[in-house]
Amino acid sequence: MRVIFAGTPEFARVALERLLAAGFTVPLVLTQPDRPAGRGMKLQASPVKQCALQHGIAVAQPLSLRLDGKYPEDAAAAKAAIEAAQADVMVVAAYGLILPQWVLNTPRLGCLNIHASLLPRWRGAAPIHRAIEAGDAETGVTIMQMDAGLDTGDMLLLEKTAISPADTTATLHDRLAQLGGRLIVEALEMAACGGLKPTPQPAEGVTYAHKIDKAESTIDWNQPAEVIARRVRAFDPFPGAATTLGADAIKVWSCEIDSCSRTLDAACGQILSIDADGIGVACGAGSLLRLTVLQRAGGKRLPAADFLRGFPLAPGMVLGAAP
């Protein structure tokens, strides 16, 4: 079976590697253009492009696939490459470009998407972050037959995984990437013998995982500790849950909900205790959060005890207050 692969980040690279290991022929890879990255802001190829080049696969990096859009020459060149590949199917995983109808219609078996949620819950760009942020007990991967809508196509395969209280977006991402890679191989093997049975998504339970905005990273200490703790986990590794002390920026990478209730006369964001277990901070609804791993601007992630050696804090200080 000939497979065009469209994807960009590490999540997609894992799937591409699994397809190649399973023996599928991949004549063409579509991925986002190289972007500036790192401290030197040098152009960097996506993980999927790096993988494709290592395996000697042709790569196309159009700015758009819309023939009537802003970059018609890019789209026309991509169309020629896609048609020349004579693929049976296109596999899409976190590609980052909208696929026009002509793309969906070109492969014999259409386009299959690896989506990191249990559809129809968390359609959209950030399903892993939003599942953790919402406190979901489970998530998973759905292999979907793509249509013109936003993650609205028929479901082909689905598998669940539990979200543990310790999961961050980073750990859950890696687990779902492996799951997605395994499921897409199973889906294509089933498709080769006509064994896939499309199931329409239910009309109930639709939610949208909107793209993460960096502005969301600011911790609102008026929220209950449980809500803040979920956001800390959801925003690891990006954008990181952030607060301030005066003019100094601080990121919180790990925390624990303290079962002890706090005095209600303490201001939300006020540091109530500092000990070997971390920094106790007053939160909304009379709750208490213990910060255990922190980072100051330009620094490294550090356990609270090490962080405090270079950034002294004291009970009574208020995090997130205007300088």
UniProtKB/Swiss-Prot annotation:
Q: Which GO terms describe its molecular function?
A: methionyl-tRNA formyltransferase activity
Q: Which GO terms describe its cellular component?
A: cytosol
List, alphabetically, the PROSITE patterns matched. GART
The name under which this protein is listed is Methionyl-tRNA formyltransferase
Q: Which InterPro entries match?
A: Fmt, Formyl_trans_C, Formyl_trans_C_sf, Formyl_transf_N, Formyl_transf_N_sf, Formyl_transferase-like_C_sf, GART_AS, Met-tRNA-FMT_C
Q: What does this protein do?
A: Attaches a formyl group to the free amino group of methionyl-tRNA(fMet). The formyl group appears to play a dual role in the initiator identity of N-formylmethionyl-tRNA by promoting its recognition by IF2 and preventing the misappropriation of this tRNA by the elongation apparatus.
**Domain of life the protein comes from:** Bacteria
| Protein family membership | Belongs to the Fmt family.
According to the record, the segments passing through the membrane are none
Which EC class is the enzyme in? transferase
Binding-site residues for (6S)-5,6,7,8-tetrahydrofolate, renumbered to this chain: 117-120
The protein's annotated catalytic reaction(s) are: L-methionyl-tRNA(fMet) + (6R)-10-formyltetrahydrofolate = N-formyl-L-methionyl-tRNA(fMet) + (6S)-5,6,7,8-tetrahydrofolate + H(+)
Concerning NCBIfam families, the annotation shows: fmt
This enzyme's EC code(s) = 2.1.2.9
User: What keywords is this UniProt entry annotated with?
Assistant: Protein biosynthesis, Transferase
